[in-house]
Amino acid sequence: DAVGTNAGFYELAGADELCAYYQRVMHRHFLPTGRVRYFPGCDFQGDGRFVSRLTGASWQVRVRRKLVDATYIEGAIPATSPPPFEVADGVRCVPAGEIARVHERPDRYVVIGAGKTALDACVWLLERGVAASAIRWIKPREAWWLNRRFQQPHTLVPELYRGASIQIEAMAQATSVDDLFARLEAEGILLRVDPGVTPTMFRGAVTSEPELALLRRIEDVVRMGYVRRIERDGIVLDQGRVPTSPSTLHVHCAASALARPPLRPIFEPDRITVQPFMWGFACFQFALLGVIEATVERDEEKNALCPPIAYWDRNVDYLTAFFATLVGDRARAAHPAVAAWSKGSRLNPVSGIAAYRSDPRVAEARERIKKFGAAAAMNLHKLARAG
């Protein structure tokens, strides 16, 4: 992108582009093979059964090898989940994705939620000329954000690699969880909206520094716990009440997002239960599960290559996830077929790093990783247990 809050970074796909991509892949690649049947608009009921939302028709599938269950960690989003608070009659309340379709202009906007959806809703409003003074942001927790500058692929991958090496050095030297986050913030790896409030939430969401500058214009920020009820003239929270009005639009961004169910083995005789096993990069790591299933013989060995972890929510979860990544990478690198696929896959964000070996940033980062990698793994384990 050349302009806007994403200037200098690879473009961000919108909802329509994402849907069009999956439709194209399904209809141009999968269905023509004759090996795939597609049942859109259905809900999985368990035990190989799914039901159409449109007609109520149901199907029972005989699983010949394994059922791949991606619903186990299925999260909730505002578009498909009702608000986790009461909404009185006469109150205007819409999920985040509906604010673009509002026809009657509200006097004010109240954005409810502390995560990425709420952040994006605030940025969207500000970018379209809504005055910061017309926005109230209710957030029960303050969050850390990953700097988009260090999350870019392809021609910008040297900065991603440099950012990873900075994290590893900080992880080797930190004396506590708070000290680690302070070091990463000082290096620009992590960002926060309000420098005066210490974040307690970290879900790995990404933002840019220009977006952050926009968000800091919002001064009406309410930190009184979770919203319990919206009445026509007031919003009831855990720790008090703030006024509202029928002419205010309340934007629901408070869905629970990523699920954190009890961990279970990913590979079992009759099923593959999709769960994270490394930090970030969902497309890469979940594709890697398919490679492991296809190239590794025994379930015990498969599970040893990718023991599951819970999705991250608190600050300390970042340490646990990164430790799992460092340990798991070493184990998977020792398996030839898995290592070869990982090295060549375009889903691997650093698969093209070899093309930049002469870049001084890459050479410096490689030396930093060699120097601090082992110490980082040991210290992360210690800090996570203490934190």
Which role fits each region the language model picked out?
Residues 323-387:
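C-terminal active-site-capping segments
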